Amino acid sequence: MTNPLGVILAGGLATRMGGGDKGLLQIGGQSLLARVRDRLEPQVAALALNANGDAARFADLGLPVVADSSDGVAGPRAGVLAGLDWAAGQGADAIVTAAADTPFFPTDLVARLVAASKGQTHPLVLATTPRTGEELKSGGRSKVNRHPTFGLWPVALRDDLRAALQDGLRKVVIWTDQHGGREALFDATPFDPFFNVNTPADLTRAEELLQ
């Protein structure tokens, strides 16, 4: 497999922070999106941003902006498909996605996702972290948390994903399980690297984690 392309998923709005683009919120004088870009770009062959609406608001990032390509489907599922369609036009085999509101994800994300895909016909891997004691008490048999916005996705299955979304697929992990998706386990200490900013309190915590 050639080095995958990267796609930042930035379709979410900061509804719990008054609206607007969550990725444009700042910590340490830099937007969340810029931090995600700087962390993912060295790991991939090329990088694009998945977002809808006026692309001009992201001009400072210097990235191509790819809008959702699936009618009637919103959220990260549509963003993954849009990224796969973009990558197909670039002649790539796979993409790695990262969420725009998660600025501390591992700097070896791509390498470890690719390593976990060894031997797969179609590379399909999601990032995971161990569940904590409290999470384990809440029920469920899984001992890990899956992070479907952080994954390695095969371009060859994009039409299959498109059909699944059009058929009403709501949880992309159902689709990854159907196609033999694997997991790459990442350490969650001293904090979960896939911690994402959803609330003003999260933004404050992110500022503290920078220190």
Predicted segments with their positions:
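Nucleotide and nucleotide-moiety/phosphate-recognizing core
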Residues: 1-172, 177-193, 200-201, 208-211
